[in-house]
Structures are given as structure tokens and as C-alpha cells.
Amino acid sequence: MAKAPPSEPKLLLFNKPFDVLTQFNDEQGRSTLKDFIPVPGVYPAGRLDRDSEGLLLLTNDGRLQARIADPRHKLPKTYWVQVEGTPDEEQLRRLREGVTLNDGPTLPAEARLLDEPTLWERVPPVRFRKSVPTHWLELVIREGRNRQVRRMTAAVGLPTLRLVRVRIGPWSLDGLGLGEWREVPARLD
């Protein structure tokens, strides 16, 4: 029997800092969502690795969570990716066509060069080496495999240095400071 939706469904947008776990408890004492979000009964709709930053959605509505997180719904997820090296047209083409990873081929991604975005300082900062150029890409994917963006850029010879998710479907980081959250209408049209 399907569980009824909560009487007051909630959907939170959270700008997750680097080195924060996307869970509410950690026996090792690392930083978690409980350090930022005082709202009881919500849980992440999807994942964002500890070493990634940016948009994380949380909800108390299991049906909404399933629609957001389930790859069958193919909600586009937009990432700004700082990579080591200078991307060429061949590398971008490979990302756009999909790359083969150890767990199989990815779906095609939208990939483009991006001017360096204005972002908050990362703590700790990304390692800087004067002799190694870095560039930013915008990648839009419609799957959610473990560490997928990092593995895709590595597969085309562009190791990821910094990864920031800026959009999931209709929701974005617009105006949300690092470590901040806000509630939005809990629906996916």
C-alpha cells in the first residue's frame, strides 16, 4: 500500500558547502546536513558527494523524492565543473555524445565551455599550479550515477578540480548563499 503524502509537504533548496555529508548523522563527527538545516522530517532527494558543492533538494514527501531522484524521470542536472587542462572540441564532442565508463555508456550530455563563474570561496581552496591551466565547463546530465560528472570528465582527459551543481530541473541556486536553504512550493509540474 502506497504511503499517503504528508499533510504539509515541504521542499527545501540547500546550497551545500564542500566537505558536508548529505546525511543528518555521522558517527565520525564530520559535518552533516544537521549542522545547517533545522527542519525535522526532511531528507535528501538524491545525492551530492562530500567533495562537491551546490544545490541539494530535501523533502518530506516520498513521492516527490522519488520523482526527483529516479533516473527514469531524467530531470536535467546542471553542473559547473572546473577541470584541469584546456578542453578541446573533441573532448566536448565526446561528452555530448556520451562516454563509456566502467559501469557502461552514459547518456549524451550538454557540454559547453563556461567563463569562470562568480562563486563563493571554497574552503579549502582548489590546489593551484601555475604550470597547469584550468577551465570551466557547464555540463547538463540526465542520469545520476555515482560520481558521474567526475568520471565523465576524467574519461575525456579533463580531471575535475571543483564541482558545483547549480540546477536540478526547475530549481536553481539563484540567490542562495553558501550553507543557506530556503523552502519552495513542494511540487514538480
Curated annotation (Swiss-Prot):
The keyword tRNA processing does not apply. Pfam families: PseudoU_synth_2. It is an enzyme of class 5 (isomerase). Transmembrane segments: none annotated. Belongs to the pseudouridine synthase RsuA family. Responsible for synthesis of pseudouridine from uracil-2457 in 23S ribosomal RNA. This is Ribosomal large subunit pseudouridine synthase E. It comes from Pseudomonas aeruginosa (strain ATCC 15692 / DSM 22644 / CIP 104116 / JCM 14847 / LMG 12228 / 1C / PRS 101 / PAO1). The gene is rluE.
